[in-house]
Amino acid sequence: MQTLRQIPSLMGKPQTHVAGEPIVALHNISARYNGRFALQDVSFDLIAGEQVAVVGPNGAGKSTLFKVIAGVLPNSGGTVSVAGSGPGTHICIAYVPQRSQVDWTFPVDVADVVMMGRIGRLGLFRRPKRADWEYVHQSLDVVGMSAFAARQIGELSGGQQQRVFIARALAQEAELMLMDEPLTGLDVRSQDDIFAVLDELRARGVTVMIATHDLNLAAERFDRVMLLNGQLLGFGQPEDVFTPERLVNAYGGHIRMLDTGDGTMIVNDTCCDQ
């Protein structure tokens, strides 16, 4: 499997955004979903090149946040800036949806799914050129899916499908990747495959936001964590964000923090109260 650093066509292009500078800036964002406020008064800056885990209970607004940043869903208040411009104006943003939102029965092969990432650069009615197909196959190689290029997307495992969608984002030449619960339903080996790809994205300087329900994984694997429940409850280092008070505010009384020999483990307590 090639690495991003071994692919000149993916690495030779200079960065559009400067590492260490904000690539995303939200100020007092509010957004509605299904007629109610899903986000209220959310503000933060995201530094180019970092990897951030967004956590919170179901209905916390994680997916809504990603859609607002990507320009898919309009905000009802506040301002969104992506690389200095409004949302929806950049093809450098890739949104990887939840697997449950994708129709995996649609008859399309893996290579064509990845080619969809080139549409923003091609335009809707232009045929892909040889260079575009090179991007497709190189992107599949990066995520270890070259051997599946002709396979129907619905025939793949959950982890393989997620890697194909990451390859689509690579073919798009995305510099900001928004991944909505890509680890949900995956076994440990498939999760490790995803994290290997994330390491390659880090080497390239791609900024990544991932929504996840696994607080321990968020604390162990990411530069910063964001705790969300309609409002921004905390954003920073895990030890500063995952405090008992904030976790209760986010999850109610169903979170327990256990001291272990290796640190603190956060447990979701779903048992009935005695």
Predicted regions and their residues:
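Conserved ABC ATPase signature
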Residues: 152-156, 160
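ABC ATPase nucleotide-binding domains
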Residues: 243-245, 249-274
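Catalytic Walker B motif of ABC-type/P-loop ATPase nucleotide-binding domains
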Residues: 177-181
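Conserved ABC ATPase "signature" region
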Residues: 115, 130-148
